[in-house]
Amino acid sequence: MNIKPLADRVLILPAPAEEKTIGGIIIPDTAKEKPLQGEVVAIGNGTKDEEMVLHVGDQVLYGKYSGTELEHDGKKYLIMRQSDVLAVLG
């Protein structure tokens, strides 16, 4: 990975969206819900006022409209401020 977030930002690899429903109905790309969970793959150095509490490998939840989408090496990522992350999972 050669993307290094700056300041209090984190780079997240979103979890894959569901391909089909429990009943077996295939969901087209246009109807899929945006995932709200992902894995932290890179973190910034923090700021003078805010220390980074997230770590690479953390599974996190974030808001539906959080972050900026970007694509790198064929994968889609989100970059957002640490404060946009709502929770760390288990």
Swiss-Prot record:
Family: Belongs to the GroES chaperonin family.
Cross-referenced InterPro entries: Chaperonin_GroES (IPR020818), Chaperonin_GroES_sf (IPR037124), GroES-like_sf (IPR011032)
GO MF annotations in UniProt: ATP binding; metal ion binding; protein folding chaperone; protein-folding chaperone binding; unfolded protein binding
Role this protein plays: Together with the chaperonin GroEL, plays an essential role in assisting protein folding. The GroEL-GroES system forms a nano-cage that allows encapsulation of the non-native substrate proteins and provides a physical environment optimized to promote and accelerate protein folding. GroES binds to the apical surface of the GroEL ring, thereby capping the opening of the GroEL channel.
Superkingdom of origin: Bacteria
Subunit annotation: Heptamer of 7 subunits arranged in a ring. Interacts with the chaperonin GroEL.
Protein name: Co-chaperonin GroES
SMART domains, per database record: Cpn10
CDD domains xrefs: cpn10 (cd00320)
GO cellular component: cytoplasm
GO BP terms: chaperone cofactor-dependent protein refolding
Pfam families noted in UniProt: Cpn10
Organism whose genome encodes this protein: Phocaeicola vulgatus (strain ATCC 8482 / DSM 1447 / JCM 5826 / CCUG 4940 / NBRC 14291 / NCTC 11154)
Compartmental location: Cytoplasm
Nucleotide-binding recorded as keyword: no
Keyword Manganese appears in the UniProt entry: no
Swiss-Prot/TrEMBL keywords: Chaperone, Cytoplasm
NCBIfam families found in the cross-reference section: PRK00364.2-2, PRK00364.2-4
PANTHER family reported in the protein's UniProt record: 10 KDA HEAT SHOCK PROTEIN, CO-CHAPERONIN GROES
